[in-house]
Amino acid sequence: MNLIMLILALWAPVAGSMPELSLTLFDEPPPLVETEPLPPLPDVSEYRVEYSEARCVLRSGGRLEALWTLRGNLSVPTPTPRVYYQTLEGYADRVPTPVEDISESLVAKRYWLRDYRVPQRTKLVLFYFSPCHQCQTYYVECEPRCLVPWVPLWSSLEDIERLLFEDRRLMAYYALTIKSAQYTLMMVAVIQVFWGLYVKGWLHRHFPWMFSDQW
């Protein structure tokens, strides 16, 4: 009991000397800061794309060649388009910027992409474009098809694999037959050259009776 009385005696002067805290945070509301109004958005209703077309093929070795045509009221300069390709694993954006054809027309533009190697299992090529910098972005897609001639002497096995991926089995079997015949004729020609240069001369020297008139 004496200990409690001593603590209360020491606490009384300390509590009496503590300052009173104000619980009011803001006596008056803060003043409003006047800001300048935002500039109006530019009117882009006049810019539009009325027609878009995409054509893309795969040359020998999986080299992509694509052409995109745009017609409409386009701004000058037009925003740089982007090209992506889609495979079975996903999308890729490593495609370089397409080249724009220089023409005098302001209502039509053409973009080219040549000799860019893509995977054999490419499903789609997507071309993203916009008629102006503030306009909505559009895209047009195309499915690349392997371009194989009727006599596919220079086609590779990758091209045949691409034909099978596109479910063009008849063309793939035809190309495989031509390539098999080509390799067979090449092997026959190599054997004939080897026979004439080496084997026949060796037989003449060691077995001359094989080439006598009696035979």
From Swiss-Prot:
Keyword tRNA-binding listed: no
Cytoplasmic side: 204-215
Signal peptide positions on this chain: 1-17
Membrane topology: Single-pass type I membrane protein
Pfam families: CMV_US
InterPro entries noted in UniProt: CMV_US
Transmembrane region(s): 183-203
GO biological process: one example: symbiont-mediated perturbation of host defense response
Domain Ig-like H-type, residue spans: 47-146
Ranges in the topological domain labelled Lumenal: 18-182
CC annotations in GO: host cell endoplasmic reticulum membrane; membrane
Glycosylation sites recorded in the entry for this protein: 73
Location relative to the cell: Host endoplasmic reticulum membrane
Assigned keywords, A-Z: Disulfide bond, Early protein, Glycoprotein, Host endoplasmic reticulum, Host membrane, Host-virus interaction, Immunoglobulin domain, Late protein, Membrane, Signal, Transmembrane, Transmembrane helix, Viral immunoevasion
Disulphide bonds in the chain: 56-142
Entry similarity comment: Belongs to the cytomegalovirus US6 family.
Role: Participates in the inhibition of the host immune response. Redirects newly synthesized major histocompatibility complex (MHC) class I heavy chains via the SEC61 translocon to the cytosol where they undergo proteasome-dependent destruction. In consequence, infected cells are masked for immune recognition by cytotoxic T-lymphocytes.
Self-association and partners: Interacts with host TRAM1.
Name of the protein in question: Unique short US11 glycoprotein
Protein source organism: Human cytomegalovirus (strain Towne) (HHV-5)
Lineage: Viruses, Duplodnaviria, Heunggongvirae, Peploviricota, Herviviricetes
Gene: US11
